[in-house]
Design a protein with these regions (language model features):
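Right-handed parallel beta-helix/beta-solenoid
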Residues: 1-28, 45-47, 70
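Acidic, glycine- and Ser/Thr-rich low-complexity intrinsically disordered tracts
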Residues: 321-381
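Detector for repetitive beta-architecture
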Residues: 3, 38-40, 46, 64, ...
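Acidic, turn/loop-rich segments in luminal/extracellular domains of secretory-pathway
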Residues: 431-493
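Short glycine/acidic-rich loop motifs that flank beta-strands on beta-rich extracellular proteins
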Residues: 51-54, 79-84, 103-109, 127-134, ...
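Extracellular ectodomain surface segments
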Residues: 381-434
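Right-handed parallel beta-helix/beta-spiral solenoid domain characteristic of secreted/periplasmic
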Residues: 24, 42, 49-51, 58-108, ...
Length: 497
């Protein structure tokens, strides 16, 4: 097991590359080696490599080949006219702690690969062609991408095709641009887990959506924050699909836009859509499809979701389907269902036990408190800090700050919560002020915030815009911590100038 060091500034390809003082200079030199299981290739922080990195050899499950970084400073950067990192047929590979930007193709491309992990990789400005996903895997097995960031790319954020075993965990995608770009596009794949991601298509120059799943099998999409786009989650022709506990908003590009949609491109069966907060968009859950197609839509269960600020109904069913819409919470002013008469008369899609409330935010805060209390009671041996997603909705503005508290729906085992980080900055004893896309916000350690809208920054069109701020909390002594996001939704139709 050998560690090879590569430094674009001080290295030389005449060196042996086996210690930091005798590092190689180029990735092509590494490619000339026959890497063995357990070997590592570490790129010096601060280095810039203007070449594609081809991974040709495989590790083993117990001794993967690792591509990472060393030293201090900013992450090493790979630029390339082709892909950033490219591999065919290699197995048992770990890629971590790098940045890939300004590449002509994909940031990372893997074809017919097995057991890959991509961790803490920053990918930006990829794809001179819109056909290239920033992270692309095809015909592969067991691929995990976690804690990575994709931003301002031309093409899909993730393009996954015919992969058995996919995990996308705790990633961020912002602005996947292009005429066919989604934050995540996944076709003909199975055993899928998409969890804990923040995917934002609010400012993307794309008519598409956030997550597009085509013919998924055994898929779970949970605990994500999905914002913007023509749709939130399009899950077509799937088998055994769970979509739960997501925050989905800002999907209002078209009259047909939806938070969750299914029924197109083939038969769909066994969907569980539950625990989601669906708001600030057009349709909620849309069970639909093309006219004349004979697709079946079987056992579609929509339950325990919360719907508010929708211009269309929380549930739309206009094609033959069987299932149920039960125990959902719908804010007054939002239409509950739009079910075609033929389907209603067939009694194949039942509606029961749903609730209408005056204020969804109050209901959500109460539910979060109950869940936190129950979690603490049942798991005293495993204390933790839990942060919950926060929303600020601005319908009118008179120049005064819009106020709230980030911590009131969070919880900790010792009943102490402190706001430590907001955006990319630490929160000091005098608080912190940041300037956002549409206004400025001041926060303090107690979680209080004051958002002041700057109407001069708003676009000229009507409708909605939004921006998000990440934040981190702990229990006062940093033994336990968690993080989440505040999303500010601005309804421009009602603003007072």
């Amino acid at each position: 097991m050998t560690i090879y060091y590569v430094n674009s500034t001080t290295g030389s390809d005449g060196n042996n590359g086996t210690n930091q003082t005798s590092a190689f200079a180029t990735l092509s030199k590494v490619e000339s080696l026959k890497l063995k299981p357990g070997d590592s290739v570490l790129l010096a922080k601060g280095s810039v490599f203007n070449e594609q990195f081809d991974i040709k050899y495989s590790g083993t499950e117990s001794a993967p080949i690792k591509i990472g970084s060393y030293g201090t400073g900013s992450a090493p950067v790979i630029h390339s006219n082709g892909d950033g990192i490219h591999s065919l047929y290699a197995s048992n590979i770990v890629i971590e702690n790098l940045k890939i930007s300004n590449v002509g193709g994909a940031g990372i491309y893997g074809g017919s690969v097995t057991n890959w992990t991509v961790r803490n990789v920053d990918i930006a400005k990829t794809g001179l062609s819109e056909s290239a996903g920033a992270v692309t895997f095809r015909s592969s097995t067991n691929v995990t991408v976690e804690s990575s960031k994709v931003s301002d790319v031309k093409g899909d954020g993730f393009w996954i095709e015919k992969v058995a075993g996919v995990k996308l965990l705790n990633n961020t995608v912002t602005s996947a641009n292009g005429s066919t770009a989604d934050a995540v596009q996944m076709n003909d794949s199975s055993n899928i887990l998409i969890k804990g991601n923040h995917l934002d298509q609010t400012d993307a120059s794309s008519p598409k959506g956030v997550i597009a799943l085509v013919r998924p099998t055994n898929a779970v999409v949970e605990d994500n924050v999905l914002t913007g786009g023509g749709f939130g989650i399009s899950a077509q022709a799937g088998k055994t699909v769970a979509i739960r506990d997501n925050d989905i908003s800002g999907f209002h590009g078209y009259s047909w836009s939806f938070a969750v949609g299914l029924g197109d491109q083939g038969n769909a069966r066994d969907y569980d859509i539950s625990g989601n907060h669906i708001h600030d968009g057009a349709w909620g859950v849309a069970v639909s499809g093309p006219i004349g197609a004979s697709y079946t839509r079987t056992n579609i269960k929509v339950h325990d979701n919360t719907f508010d600020d929708l211009t269309q109904a929380a549930l739309k069913v206009d094609r033959p389907a069987s299932g149920s819409f039960t125990n959902n919470t719908i804010e007054s002013g939002t239409t509950a269902t739009s079910i075609s008469p033929a389907i209603a008369d067939a009694h194949t899609f039942t509606v029961s036990g749903n609730h209408t409330v005056a204020n969804v935010e109050t209901t959500l805060a109460s539910a979060d408190t109950k869940v936190a209390s129950a979690t603490t009671t049942e798991a005293d041996a495993d204390p933790a800090v839990v942060a919950a997603h926060d929303n600020l909705k601005i319908f009118t503005d008179n120049g005064a700050a819009h106020r709230g508290n980030l911590l009131e729906n969070d919880s900790s085992d010792n009943d102490t919560l402190v706001l430590r980080r907001f955006g990319d900055e630490s929160v000091g004893k005098h608080g912190l002020t940041l300037t956002g896309d549409y206004g400025s916000i001041h926060v303090d350690r107690e979680g209080n915030y004051a958002y002041t809208l700057d109407e001069t920054k708003l676009p000229s069109h009507d409708g909605h815009v939004s921006e998000s701020f990440s934040y981190g909390i702990d229990d006062g002594n940093a033994h336990h911590s968690d993080a989440d996001t505040l999303t500010v939704y601005i309804h421009m139709d009602g603003l007072v100038s």
